[in-house]
């Protein structure tokens, strides 16, 4: 009886640990996706600003 009960307890503890780990991994993945999207957005803004500056400079020089 105690062996069966202990086995159930261990299984429940493992299940809880696995669930917590899965939530942590999912949160990390979503955070990294958000960070990658933010980096991409910043890169687009910077490249747009640089092309605008080059365009304005070329109009002023020529």
Curated annotation (Swiss-Prot):
GO terms for cellular component: cytoplasm; extracellular region; nucleus; plant-type cell wall; plasma membrane. Keywords: Cell membrane, Cell wall, Membrane, Metal-binding, Nucleus, Secreted, Stress response, Transmembrane, Transmembrane helix. The chain crosses the membrane at residues 33-53. GO terms for molecular function: metal ion binding; metal ion sequestering activity. One of its GO terms (biological process) is detoxification of cadmium ion. Heterodimers. Binds weakly to CYSTM7 and WIH1/CYSTM13. Belongs to the CYSTM1 family. This is Protein CYSTEINE-RICH TRANSMEMBRANE MODULE 2. It comes from Arabidopsis thaliana. The gene is CYSTM2.
